[in-house]
Amino acid sequence: MSDADLPNDGGIKLVMAIIRPDKLADVKTALAEVGAPSLTVTNVSGRGSQPAKKSQWRGEEYTVDLHQKVKVECVVADTPAEDVADAIADAAHTGEKGDGKIFILPVENAIQVRTGKTGRDAV
């Protein structure tokens, strides 16, 4: 079997998504269903097309222009990255501004610290 016949053209891909925090449980379920249950989750804040919110605290008005989001990272070799991205997109979708973004990036190498395995074997 050639590399072109393997998922991700024989390489390793990082699927990184910035999503609403309340959609994390749905995304985790969707990832498990497509065979990519391993993930890293980080709380982040950022700004995109979602409008800023004006609030008051102790009589002072202020603008919140950085919104709380969750970054989900999933490294895959045997599961097609497009399938992972589609699963995240379907699970995180609300149709409103601020649903997030998904990026697919190549991974040059992976090393499993415990075993020393590298490349696809480490994923």
Curated annotation (Swiss-Prot):
Inducers of expression: Expressed during ammonium starvation under nitrate-rich conditions.
Subcellular location: Cytoplasm
Keywords in alphabetical order: ATP-binding, Cytoplasm, Nucleotide-binding, Phosphoprotein
Binding site for ADP: 49, 98-101
Regulation of its function: Binds the effectors ADP and ATP. Also binds AMP with high affinity, raising the possibility that AMP could be an important PII effector, at least in archaea. The change in the ATP/AMP ratio may be more relevant for describing the energy status in the cells than the ATP/ADP ratio alone.
Residues engaged in binding ATP: 38-40, 49, 75, 98-101, 114
Chief location: cytoplasm
Entry PTM: Uridylylated on Tyr-62.
Family listed: Belongs to the P(II) protein family.
Function: Involved in the regulation of nitrogen metabolism. Regulates the activity of its targets by protein-protein interaction in response to the nitrogen status of the cell. Increases the activity of the glutamine synthetase 3 in the presence of 2-oxoglutarate. May regulate the activity of the ammonia channel Amt2 via direct interaction.
Official protein name in the record: Nitrogen regulatory protein GlnK2
